[in-house]
Curated annotation (Swiss-Prot):
Active site (catalytic residues): C142, H235, E237
EC top class, as a word: transferase
Site (Important for substrate specificity): S192
The protein's name: Homoserine O-succinyltransferase
Family: Belongs to the MetA family.
Endpoints of the signal sequence: none
Location in or out of the cell: Cytoplasm
Species: Shigella flexneri serotype 5b (strain 8401)
Amino acid sequence: MPIRVPDELPAVNFLREENVFVMTTSRASGQEIRPLKVLILNLMPKKIETENQFLRLLSNSPLQVDIQLLRIDSRESRNTPAEHLNNFYCNFEDIQEQNFDGLIVTGAPLGLVEFNDVAYWPQIKQVLEWSKDHVTSTLFVCWAVQAALNILYGIPKQTRTDKLSGVYEHHILHPHALLTRGFDDSFLAPHSRYADFPAALIRDYTDLEILAETEEGDAYLFASKDKRIAFVTGHPEYDAQTLAQEYLRDVEAGLDPDVPYNYFPHNDPQNKPRASWRSHGNLLFTNWLNYYVYQITPYDLRHMNPTLD
């Protein structure tokens, strides 16, 4: 699905260098089809890097996807130029009267911060409440999963004593589920989190269906039966070097982090890591766009009435 983005967005040239099909707004205007409208609430500090990662995964399908970037934190960013934020991001007030086919809420480095201490916690709650009536399907990633489980289901924050960092094996529980269609029986995906997601907790306190688990019994991928919300507790969008960059950052900060599990060849940080999760990440986002967004969203977004088969 060629993603439709502003002509000047840095991701255009970045992704074209990888031979990723990106359609600029000026070119897309000549195609007489309705693109899917996908809103990305980017909570990560390095916003340009995160844009590149998610846009790469949203790009590999035959329909247009019109991307809108959203920010809810008005504080000055230390990692993203103000000019970039002003040019390519909207505020919630700009879009609260609009409807969207899809919403992606990214992770955030807030695993050890209590929810009420998050500077934009009220805004997160506002967006999630708004999405119930204005978005066909929402995908939550990593920390956003923990936030959504608290807001939507009242589940208290669950925190690990040590950070889960590395590339872990997972297995699917429902081979015919639409979100895992085409998945191998077992697959690899990266994690980088303090948040804890015991599968038993999800089963006991929600009506969500767990579709894939880690080998240790943590929930990795789960969703509502009506396809309106989906959750992925890892980082399938990560680049090959992202975990290495996080590890070196923590080393330089004197945090004495563990070497990310199953990531560096021979467990040696001097060796160049390889992405072993890329096909899984692409298939996950393609399935979400197709089965959870495109197949149930109304043609006329002025009337939000997602329909199941």
